Amino acid sequence: AQTAQEAVQWTYMGYLASVKSQDGAAMSFGRVSTFFDVYFERDLKSGKITETDAQEIIDNLVMKLRIVRFLRTKDYDAIFSGDPYWATWSDAGFGDDGRTLVTKTSFRLLDTLTLEHLGPGPEPNITIFWDPKLPEAYKRFCAKISIDTSAIQYESDKEIRSHWAMRRHRMPASPRMRGGQADA
């Protein structure tokens, strides 16, 4: 990818191809904010995009993640409302070196939830790896968005990190190691 738009678009296309090939089984979107932020910061610095453009790219990505659909049986639809496919976007927490993984794109993701035309929806499931040591501004913003939208779930970054280290990312049921399932 040469630009932030391309990085986001290619990540989405890769995710869409993967989730479609597994016929809707739960598949994490991942912890991508830090990856995207590298492209956003470079494009912002060079003047290719504005902060408004960066926010719009994330808004559009969230909307695209919400419109993924599968052909389901009536029995399946009777069990699960809203045709969920359990796409989890994980964010925040800390790296093994103690650096926060909160980025400007972490704020952009949460800001998308304030769009009046977006409304509530199951996808993407936004999971914040919470730690009391996260930046104060981010914790306050998480609290505000949680109160306003009820659209965020939280997991203890410290507990997950103690077991999975930096190899973790979030699945709807349990953390999983990249590249294969690890022995628990």
Regions flagged by a language model, labelled:
Residues 1-184:
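Conserved catalytic cores of very large enzyme subunits
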